[in-house]
């Protein structure tokens, strides 16, 4: 779940009944899978593949969604950092609105990436952890270096810190590429070998209408 459903965000909120169960009834009569065996590894990979696809489908089916957004992060200090940055990007209302408007706005993506750990620190502190403990867990640590960051939107490189920041790109072609049912945003942090991804969707007028016209 850490690499799949935990990396899914439609609007950043969590329902009180968000739960994942994996159940085995034994009705198939198969032999039990032994822990740490080859079969266990294969089963784990199969479950993760199914979980990833279901998470993608849930993101695409978000309220009012017209675009499935996948953010893939590489070059992070570790996988946890990469997942945090990816989730911060797809959870950003400004990024989601830019996706809906077909705006290849690298600034919003960079800003969201830079805020990744700040959000985590707030969560830790809300859970009753001292601010110094939150900091020791990397909650407020800067994990994005703008001088090393690279951002690509729908296959178009739009920012490269190594060559001075924003790069010249065909904005019309980028906007056209963004006008698709699925969008891929890629970030290379240039800091290590960590990788991660997250799944979300755009923010549309229909989302506001749907969530403002009913009560629970």
Q: Predicted segment positions?
A:
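A structural signal for small-residue-enriched, beta-sheet-centric alpha/beta enzyme cores
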Residues: 1-216
């Amino acid at each position: 779940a850490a690499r799949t459903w935990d990396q899914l965000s439609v609007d950043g909120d969590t329902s009180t009944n968000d739960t994942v169960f994996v159940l085995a009834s034994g009705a198939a009569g198969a032999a039990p899978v032994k822990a740490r065996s080859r079969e266990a590894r294969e089963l784990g990979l199969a479950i993760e593949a199914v979980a990833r696809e279901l998470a993608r489908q849930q993101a695409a089916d978000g309220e009012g969604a017209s675009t499935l957004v996948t953010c893939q992060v590489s070059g992070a200090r570790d996988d946890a950092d990469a997942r945090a940055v990816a989730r911060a990007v797809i959870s950003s209302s400004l990024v989601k609105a830019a996706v809906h408007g077909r705006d290849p706005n690298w600034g919003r993506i960079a800003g969201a990436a830079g805020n990744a750990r700040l959000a985590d620190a707030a969560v830790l502190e809300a859970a009753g952890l001292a601010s110094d403990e939150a900091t020791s867990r990397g909650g407020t640590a800067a994990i994005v270096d703008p001088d090393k960051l690279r951002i690509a939107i729908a296959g178009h490189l739009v920012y490269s810190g190594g060559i001075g920041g924003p790069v010249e790109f065909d904005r019309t072609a980028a906007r056209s590429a963004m006008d698709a049912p699925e969008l891929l945003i890629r970030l290379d942090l240039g800091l290590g070998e960590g990788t991660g991804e997250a799944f979300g969707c755009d923010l549309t007028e229909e989302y506001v209408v749907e969530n403002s016209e009913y009560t629970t």
